[in-house]
Amino acid sequence: MLFELKSPFKPMGDQPEAIRQLVEGVNDHLPAQTLLGVTGSGKTFTMANVIAETQRPTLILSHNKTLAAQLYAEMRSFFPDNAVEYYVSYYDYFQPEAYLPSTDTYIEKDLSINMELDQLRLSAVNTLLSGRRDVVVVSSVSCIYGMGNPQDFHDNMISLKVGQMIDKDDLLRRLINAQYTRNDIALQRGNFQAKGETIDVFLVSTDIILRIVLCFDEIESLETLDVTTGHMVAEYDEYTIPPASIFTTTKERADRAVDEIAIDLGEQIRFFESLGDEVKAERIKERVTYDVEMIKEVGYCTGIENYSRYFDGRKPGERPFCLLDCFPDDFLVIVDESHVTVPQIRGMGGNDRTRKTNLVENGFRLPSAFDNRPLSFDEFEALVKQVIFVSATPANYELQRCEGIVAEQLIRPTGLLDPLIEVRPSVTQIDDLLEEIHKCVENDDRAIVTTFTKRLAEELDEYMREHGVRSSYIHSEVDTLDRVRILDELRAGEIDVVIGVNLLREGIDLPEVSLVAILDADKEGFLRNETSLTQTVGRAARNLNGKAIMYADTITKSMQRTMDETERRRAKQMRYNLEHGITPKQIVKGRNTLLDNEQLKETREMFGAVIEPIVDKQKIGTSAKQKSLSIVADGTTIDYQSVPDLQKEIDKTREAMLTAAKALDFLEAAHKRDYMLMLQERLDKLTKK
């Protein structure tokens, strides 16, 4: 099947030229290209057009889960008939195993796995290994971490056909080898049950149950059942059951792995004994022997990932298998916000190695633990044959890789220009800033202020409040959900200014912000380099009156480069608007009000994996409460419904909410949630009478 891009929009501005240049580069097999796109220029739409025109299976890399979820939702809207997958870390919480020699403290691994995200990861692997080429996988850097051997995953797929002869016991053994667990009492995801000649398999990668009906070792029928009702959804002539985990192996390899672990254990014991360290020798013997017995008895043990090299059939030091191994050879990689994502990929391995060195040297793990690791940056580069870096501020690495040839996308569909930049003396920066914020508030606009330290952010917030400004601060010690709430309050006009340090750059979409103020802009360093300054200034690029003020006593090289580049972009944007008769238009976007913390907690429990994307997406679209009110106005008059009718409506709305959440349709999910809460409130009032 081919990629088919569906959108009411057509490429405009300098999008057509950027698309042409990038497509031409991909078809000419250029190893690296860069798309320099300003905030609001439609970079995601350009990515989608490149994918559609090149027809390449594509991996899109993002530097965090929330932005990855936004990209995933957008790509699904562009390619509704193609396979768009989401692959991020499936941990809600993860505390790695560690040993601190200085205090002789051993820390057990502790984790919480999000089953919804695990399902999405498995779906991505299954789709890629199915042979489809119309596949887009949106991923975090989780894609460079180890997974099972893709060949083993493929070999453990179970292909079934109506009329096929198969021994029932053999089929059950194959299901167990594919990591499914027998459960004849309560069928759950990843389980199967066998009753008579009927075998039901609750697939992990989809929300369906596959029913296999046998008749004298012949497959009589293959049906999929609705998980909730148990009713038949569809009949199939053939069906392939994917493994229940991306960490799977064959029985032969598992048997061989146990033998290899025993050999390496003997060598490590002799090594410690040669050093005269009987404590470590006994520790490693005890721990690994127990692990091996667990593997023999139940097929796994705590920390089994530290033995992954044996199960994968890899040699010592050989790189791990990862998601990239599941793609065909001609796949395309798009690195979004590359100035952040590339350094993140580069830095993944260092801390991992240091932590495991302590475990290995002190007899807690075999040296094979070193081979359970993310890809090194060199290994990542070797696997990626063609890459497009996407950023408003590409770093030197990206520019060097593409030899300075950059596709520019500086024109916004709205005609908005990059913000004006002013430099003002820092000696009077606080008083001047206060005056500017008051002007901003008078125009019903908002402001963002970036400081150099967390302490200064808090002190400035207190100062603003004392002078009648509704403000709040954001920095790394502020909880994630609180950050989202604060930004939503800024958009809603409940506060006028947000003061931050380094959390107001990539991915923050705030059309109401007309003023960005950068305090101590002349303090060179990570927070005030060209990339950081340009990204921060860009937060005012979605407002018609956008302006940035840099408070500084001297103009640094980074400041000058930022101003020169911004002026170059403004000149090109103004020239384009003049030539095409375009009048810049203010972006008008609706807002949703976040729930209070207790409601957020309840909603997280209902939505599971996707609460953070839902919360983040609430910054876009019409207010969910307004939508809920409009539903009531359109005919569902809840004030006059009976208790049974209200309960039915609540159940129906909850089901629709969960369906939307699973589909990552965040706005619809939020809409249904608020409507359900309104119904529940009315029901509570009726039942108390």
Model-derived regions, located:
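Conserved pre-motif I regulatory segment
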Residues: 1-36
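Short amphipathic alpha-helical segment within the helicase RecA-like ATPase core
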Residues: 69-77, 97-99, 459-463
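Walker A/P-loop
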Residues: 28-50
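Conserved strand-helix element at the start of the C-terminal RecA-like helicase core
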Residues: 57-69, 86, 280, 440-462
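Pre-Walker A (Motif I) flank of P-loop NTPase domains
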Residues: 28-34, 56-57, 133-135, 445-446
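Conserved RecA-like helicase motor-core motifs
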Residues: 80-89, 303, 446-448, 460-482
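Conserved helicase ATPase core of P-loop NTP-dependent helicases/translocases
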Residues: 478-500
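N-terminal cationic and glycine-rich segments that engage phosphates or anionic surfaces
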Residues: 87-432, 436-442, 461, 465, ...
